[in-house]
């Protein structure tokens, strides 16, 4: 019986987003793919483990979907949005309730400056209970900024920081905001 647990890996893209990898225990290739994604790798050799696992191993259900997510994460780290999109779609076709597939596809959309699509996917990830919601809130804040909704972005950066208090990325983003109260008449 193959088991899987969720883990995360943070990678900075041009949009500065956070990626969530899925740890898969099973075949050697799937395990190596999972480890590479979790360790923040994005090189071709690491991605090859994922491709081998998908092409040669008998992965079922969530393990197969998780391997697509991991390969998509590596592609996303390199800025290969089109290829990562295909992998996230493949994962969602197999496991439509896998929150990590939604959060990563949402990050991909944000990287492509398709902010509304990103927002929709990130909201879905949060609804499904993504394991590290701070990453979804951070990426959603980026989407809100892209949609010129600074107030919502501010609150999502705050929420990301509340969930992970020492995380530098939302701390840095919050430094750009100036919050003031409106002056009331009288």
Please report, for each region that a protein language model flagged, where it lies by residue.
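Conserved structural position within tetratricopeptide repeats
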Residues: 52-55, 59, 90-93, 124-127, ...
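N-terminal leader/linker segments that initiate helical-solenoid repeat arrays
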Residues: 19-59
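Residue-level recognition of tetratricopeptide repeat
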Residues: 64, 98, 132-133, 167
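Register position in tetratricopeptide repeats
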Residues: 77, 111-112, 146, 173-183
């Amino acid at each position: 019986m193959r088991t899987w647990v969720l883990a995360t890996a943070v990678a900075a893209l041009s949009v500065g987003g956070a990626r969530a990898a899925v740890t898969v225990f099973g075949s050697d290739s799937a395990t190596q793919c999972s480890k590479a994604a979790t360790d923040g790798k994005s090189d071709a050799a690491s991605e090859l483990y994922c491709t081998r696992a998908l092409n040669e191993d008998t992965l079922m259900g969530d393990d197969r979907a998780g391997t697509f997510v991991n390969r998509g994460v590596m592609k996303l780290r390199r800025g290969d949005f089109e290829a990562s999109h295909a992998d996230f779609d493949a994962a969602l076709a197999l496991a439509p309730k896998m929150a990590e597939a939604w959060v990563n596809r949402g990050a991909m959309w944000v990287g492509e400056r398709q902010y509304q699509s990103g927002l929709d996917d990130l909201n879905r990830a949060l609804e499904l209970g993504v394991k590290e919601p701070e990453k979804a809130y951070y990426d959603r804040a980026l989407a809100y900024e892209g949609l010129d909704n600074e107030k919502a972005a501010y609150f999502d950066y705050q929420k990301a920081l509340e969930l992970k208090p020492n995380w530098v990325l939302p701390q840095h983003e919050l430094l750009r905001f100036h919050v003031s109260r409106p002056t009331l008449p009288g």
